Regions:
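Glycine-rich segments within core transmembrane alpha-helices of 12-TM secondary carriers
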Residues: 146-167, 356-366
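Structural signature of the two symmetry-related core transmembrane helices
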Residues: 83-98, 292-307
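Intracellular juxtamembrane helix-capping segments at the cytosolic ends
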Residues: 124-138, 330-344
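A membrane-interface helix-boundary motif in multi-pass transporters
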Residues: 44-48, 167-192, 372-391
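Multi-pass alpha-helical transporter architecture, strongest
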Residues: 10, 65-73, 193-204, 382-407
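Helix-to-loop junctions at the C-terminal end of transmembrane segments
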Residues: 65-80, 277-289, 374
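Juxtamembrane intracellular "pre-TM" segments in multi-pass secondary transporters
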Residues: 2-10, 206-232
């Protein structure tokens, strides 16, 4: 698998995810959201609420923008050049860097505007990254390459997290270094980190163009090859995946009593096991078939989340959480490689626009249903059961599809 890195294009592709993964890791997941709620916002509860609204608004904007590209994009341009995606890459860098200028006393709404624009830009940049797989893959290596890239993404997130940890460790008691708050440096750091590892891919693919989406051609492609069943399956298991990410820290804290430092260590450990999972599954996917790889991951997650619902042991929770991390990376990477193999080259843009739309829809629907269940039952544990239900539903169209493909 690692011999693939001998190719400059593949190295650049993997390093691209290594770079941009710092954005969801540091801005959306670990540090910046808490800094905004505690410091910039007028009140922590208000800040947490506004942060959630901003991310929801960004997801809706992404969905609308991708819908426009999918449905109407072809009316405006027949081919999409690299410059289109490069523009959004610059936007992501600019608005992420700009977070440096917001501290206590700043307008609490303006940094959220920067978050929304950078988030939408990140999603478009991520669309480019997924699309690029079909341009750089080699014969019979799609599964290995997709998982290798996903592993690099995990690794980039962990590496950027480690750098911020070191800055915090060597800062003073007020978390300042060179008279600047470490948390203010997170935005510029993510921007520079993304640029440092991201520009290489644009350089090696500067002559590449992508066919503008044609929704009618995509529908024909999907129907003729039975891919609609896979997309239905993807919709359900992606709701489960998004819900796991959204509620993992709450499950850890309120059911199993993990402290904040333990939750942080758990998140790092899950990402580390995600790297292992991608490397293990990726090393055999092209022999077993991408569909088989996805099937194994769904089954593994279904069993683990069912056990999680019933378990009360602190140590069992750790084992389950790490194994969930093992499967949660490959299920996404193998889904991507399946689409790349089964969708015609001229329909890749349309397919991955739809793929990203599903992702944004799931980021709202999955957590909403889990949250609604928790509210109706007044139990976080009952909320967990929604996740294996999603996974079970994803197996129904998947089993019908299995007889048609072995890729």
């Amino acid at each position: 698998m690692f011999s693939l890195l001998n190719s400059k294009k593949i190295r650049s592709w993997c390093l691209f995810d290594f770079g941009i993964s710092s954005y969801p890791t540091l801005i959306l997941t670990f540090f910046y959201g808490a800094f905004y709620a505690k410091t910039i916002s007028s009140d922590p509860n208000v800040g947490t609420s506004l942060w959630g609204f901003a991310l929801s608004a960004a997801s809706i904007l992404c969905f609308l923008l991708l819908s426009f590209i999918l449905i109407s994009g072809r009316n405006f341009f027949r081919n999409i050049k690299i410059g289109f995606f490069k523009f959004f890459f610059y936007l992501m860098i600019f608005f992420t860097f700009g977070l440096f200028f917001f501290d206590k006393g700043s307008n609490q709404f303006l940094p959220l505007f920067f978050i929304v624009i950078s988030f939408v830009s990140f999603e478009i940049v991520n669309l480019f990254y997924n699309l690029s797989l079909c341009k750089i893959r080699k014969k019979n290596t799609t599964g290995a390459l997709s998982n290798l890239g996903w592993a690099f993404g995990y690794l980039g997130g962990l590496a950027s997290l480690f750098v911020v940890f070191m800055l915090l460790k060597f800062s003073n008691e007020s978390f300042t270094i060179f008279n600047i708050k470490v948390f203010l440096l997170i935005g510029p750091f993510v921007a520079i980190w993304s640029a440092l590892y991201g520009f290489s891919l644009f350089n090696v693919m500067k002559e590449v163009q992508f066919k503008s989406p044609n929704i009618l051609e995509l529908i024909k492609n999907v129907r003729s090859r039975g891919i609609s069943n896979f997309l239905i399956s993807y919709f359900f298991f992606n709701n489960a995946v998004v819900s796991i990410f959204a509620f993992a820290s709450m499950i850890a804290a309120f059911i199993f009593g993990l402290s904040e430092s333990e939750i942080l260590f758990l998140g790092v450990s899950i990402n580390f096991f995600g790297i292992i999972g991608c490397l293990v599954i990726g090393s055999v996917e092209d022999r077993m078939g991408s569909l088989n790889a996805v099937k194994i991951c769904i089954s593994g997650l279904l069993i683990l989340t069912l056990i999680l619902y019933f378990t009360e042991s602190y140590y069992s929770f750790w084992v389950i959480a790490l194994l969930v991390g093992f499967f949660i990376g490959p299920i996404q990477a193998s889904s991507r490689s399946f689409l790349v193999q089964k969708i015609k080259a001229q329909n890749q843009m349309a397919a991955f626009s739809l793929y990203s739309m599903f992702g944004n829809l799931c980021s709202i629907l999955g957590p909403f249903l889990v949250g609604l269940t928790i509210q109706l039952t007044d139990s976080i544990r009952f909320g967990i059961i929604v996740i294996p239900i999603f996974l079970f539903l994803s197996l129904i169209p998947f089993l019908k599809l299995y007889s048609k493909f072995n890729v």
